[in-house]
Structure formats: C-alpha cells, structure tokens
Design a protein with these regions (language model features):
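Charged/polar low-complexity intrinsically disordered segments
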Residues: 2-7
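Intrinsic-disorder-associated, low-complexity terminal segments enriched in Asp/Asn/His/Tyr and depleted
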Residues: 9-11
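Intrinsic-disorder-associated interaction segments
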Residues: 14-15, 179
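Positively charged n-region of N-terminal signal peptides that target proteins for export
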Residues: 16-21
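Cyclophilin-like peptidyl-prolyl cis-trans isomerases
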Residues: 34-246
Length: 246
C-alpha cells in the first residue's frame, strides 16, 4: 500500500535503494530461467517410410503432452505402422502389435488399459488440418471421453461450405451439450483450410504438425483394405524429441 502512494519510495536512502534493486534483480534472474523452461514447446520429429514430419506438443494439455513425450523418449513408436488411414479424414498409429503384424491383419484393437483424463480445450485447440489428437473408445463404453494412452491420429479432413458445416455444428452442439461449440473463427478455418469438425469437443487435441504437412497428405491418400489398413505398410522408422522452442 505504501508503495502505491509513493511514500516509501521517496524515503529510501541511496544505499537502501541499491540493496532493494540488487535483491530484485537476483530474484528475476532466478525466476526467469524457470519460467522460460515452462513456456517452451516440445517438438517431435517422425521419420516414416513416406517421409518426415514434425509435430509441436501443446503446453496447455500437459497430461497428454508429457505422456506422449515420455513414450517418444522411450522409443515406443519406433517401428509401428499407421494402421488406420481414411482419405479426407485422418491417419492413425500407436498399436504396439502393428510392429510385427502380418499383411492384412486387423489392427487397432490392442491398447493399454491405462487411459488419460480428457484435456479438451475449445475453442483454442480443435480438429483443424494438421491437428494431433489421441484416439479413444466410443461414448457407449467411455462416457468420460478418456483418451487412449498410446494411439494417436493426425487430422487431414476436408473443407466445408457454410451450408455443409451448419448440420455438423448442430450435431457437435448436441454431442457436447453446449451451444456454439464451433465458433465463427473455427468455422472460417474449416471453410478455407479444412479439418474434421465433427470430432470437436469429444477428443483431446494436444499438438499440431508444424513441418511436413505434405507427408500427412501423402499418407492419407494411400490405398487401403476394408479395415482402413494401408495395403502397403506405412511405418514409423523413428520418433524423437528434436528440441524445444519458446
């Protein structure tokens, strides 16, 4: 209170003022590196048989981002297939049994019993093109919309005219129990860039592709069987943390 009125400031002698400044500078020098580390975004590079791409993990979905980073650092995704690919929708990976799967075998059913609490953060993170999200079981068996611990997908999607997007917005509002789930700014991006708006508010988006989006396009175009598995394997050769940036 005194500082706001200016009384204490004017009563300070030069030595006392210098002491206060030194303490203040030391405090900032200690706090700044810590806050800097907390504000960095982790990036992960995927090297695949179809090319390379890099994703950025979001800071404000800490449970998913940290868990995913731990899996990457442990080498979990190395050698796994993109076992489910749907053109104009998304590509999916993370089934541990896909590493040595024979051709034509149905994949995607195996998963860890562990699940992650949802971190759905609309309207900030949604299913625009290039979004990285975790798969999950349906609402019938998973009403809490908890995420798979390992299986992720990357959105490609398609563009929407306002008329085509209108019924999707209505269905999403019904699914989430909220009005205006897809905001006007989100709708504009779906109309011009594309994505999968029907998933909004129901799955956790925790990252985005920042490099190599053309590789996602290439993968989502491959020929698949009746189970959406690519006829020719698309494999993750390696996934690694390539750095952190502010």
């Amino acid at each position: 209170p005194q500082g706001r009125e200016g009384k204490t400031h004017h009563d300070l002698t030069p030595p006392s003022l210098m002491h206060r400044l030194i303490v203040l500078l030391c405090t900032f020098s200690l706090l700044f590196p810590l806050s800097g580390r907390a504000r960095r975004d982790t990036q992960v590079e995927f090297v695949t048989t179809a090319g390379n791409f890099t994703v950025r993990l979001l800071r404000d979905t800490p449970v998913h981002s940290r868990h995913f980073e731990q899996l990457v650092r442990a080498g979990y995704y190395n050698g796994l297939l993109f076992h489910r690919v749907i053109r104009d929708f998304m590509i999916q990976a993370g089934d541990s049994t896909s590493r040595n799967a024979a051709p034509g075998v149905l994949l995607g059913e195996a998963d860890r019993k562990e699940t992650l609490a949802p971190e759905i953060d609309l309207p900030y993170h949604y299913h625009r093109r290039g979004a990285l999200a975790m798969a999950r079981e349906s609402d019938e068996v998973n009403p809490g919309r908890r995420s798979s611990a390992t299986q992720f997908y990357i959105v490609w999607g398609k563009t929407f005219t306002p008329a085509r997007l209108a019924p999707v917005r209505a269905r999403v509002d019904e699914a989430t129990g909220q009005e205006g789930t897809i905001t006007s700014s989100m709708a504009e991006e779906y109309e011009h860039t594309g994505g999968a708006p029907h998933l909004d508010g129901q799955y956790t988006v925790f990252g985005e592709v920042v490099k190599g989006l053309s590789v996602i396009d290439k993968i989502q175009r491959v020929a698949t069987d009746d189970n959406d598995r690519p006829l020719e394997d698309v494999r993750i050769l390696s996934a690694r943390v390539v750095g952190e940036r502010r």
